[in-house]
Amino acid sequence: MTAFTYFKDEWTPVIDDYLAKHLASEVEDQKISQIMAYSVMAGGKRLRPLLFLATLNALGRKIEEPEIRIACGIELIHTYSLIHDDLPAMDNDDYRRGKLTSHKKWGEAEAILAGDALLPMGIQWIAEGSKSAKLVDLITKAVGPNGMVGGQYLDIDSTNNASVAGDAKFINKMEWLKTGCLIQASVEMAAVYAGASDIEQVKLV
């Protein structure tokens, strides 16, 4: 097994436990907490929070509660994007990871609100854990109109635009914005948080 596999096996349960406990304890309304947790705890790979923590580990930074909170904040934001991507107005998916999507399980309005709640809560966790405006800046840029949301717009626009069908450059840009930006941000945030040098940051991202 690779070093990352060992790291993943050690830290995935920690991430899962933190997400489950804090979604239950920090969301006052039990129903919206349940709807949020349905998607967050649906068995994702936790790639983004693991990359954040693994980068910290590689840079010699000790992983404690604040670092786990930041990592889990990234996962909340990722889950928000999945809930909204699955909506009828977007990709219109009925299943994700072998389970009904949020809007199929709870209703479209409820799914929208769950996503709407996860996004700011994720940013809140990152801000609270890091005490860093720079990390908040990095995550909001990664998920905004020049990042993840921009990629989803290109995806939607491409369905009505025959001129980009099969265009490798367009597809690569769309996939980078939809997926790559948040993955890169997870590593970059860890590098900034750990105080990596400019040269180290360039090598990492």
Roles of regions detected by a PLM:
Residues 11, 23-205:
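Mg2+-dependent prenyl diphosphate-binding active-site environment of isoprenoid biosynthetic enzymes
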Residues 1-23:
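N-terminal amphipathic/basic leader segments beginning at the initiator methionine
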